[in-house]
Amino acid sequence: MGFFKKKEKKAEFDVFRLYGLHHPEPGKCDEITTRGYSISMSVDKARRVIDQIRGRSYAETLMILELMPYRACYPIFKLIYSAAANASHNKQFNKANLIISKAEVNKGITLKKVKPRARGRSYMIKRPTCHITIVLRDITHFDSYDKFLESLTPKKLIALLGLMSTGRRRELLCGRFRENHKIKSFLYKIALFKRYEVM
């Protein structure tokens, strides 16, 4: 029955797991979510605005929404402003350290009305709605995170990327995050980097 024999647990000191205790995974305590339900707007019109702000900082997002000439900007602006106020009041986050880690638009119910026409006929009016979800994330702990990554050898860094959740890996390897935290140069030197970037 050696095939079903359990593997012995290694008693080695796992520095990656220890470091992960101080920096929680997505959805634990460094995120705040705001949802807007049944906003009277089509999904496509809201999504073209949402795609422009995903992954950006809070201040940059507000500036973009104020200057874009679309009607969808106002309800999205209100949602993000409300999410930042909740993060500042409820969790004592600094607004300067918030980024839009997740922004999505889903189709809502379609309101139907009847428009009377000539000769007793009627036409159907369809008013589409959408549900918008905004997730703000505090990146304060990432100030020391890039220094920790720079101290690792390429082999250990690749092992760390393998232990990360998919959400944290995408956030670490996205272009805007690399530019903001100046960790672009040493990540490009690592073998298998492209393998993780496309995931």
UniProtKB/Swiss-Prot annotation:
It is found in: Plastid, Chloroplast. One of its GO terms (biological process) is translation. One of its GO terms (molecular function) is structural constituent of ribosome. The keyword DNA-binding does not apply. Gene3D superfamilies: Ribosomal protein L22/L17. One of its GO terms (cellular component) is large ribosomal subunit. Keywords: Chloroplast, Plastid, Ribonucleoprotein, Ribosomal protein, RNA-binding, rRNA-binding. InterPro entries: Ribosomal_uL22, Ribosomal_uL22_bac/chlpt-type, Ribosomal_uL22_bac/org-type, Ribosomal_uL22_CS, Ribosomal_uL22_sf. Coiled coil: none annotated. NCBIfam families: rplV_bact. Belongs to the universal ribosomal protein uL22 family. Component of the chloroplast large ribosomal subunit (LSU). Mature 70S chloroplast ribosomes of higher plants consist of a small (30S) and a large (50S) subunit. The 30S small subunit contains 1 molecule of ribosomal RNA (16S rRNA) and 24 different proteins. The 50S large subunit contains 3 rRNA molecules (23S, 5S and 4.5S rRNA) and 33 different proteins. uL22c binds 5S rRNA in vitro; the central segment of the protein (approximately amino acids 30 to 124) but not the last 28 amino acids are required for this binding. This is Large ribosomal subunit protein uL22c. The gene is rpl22.
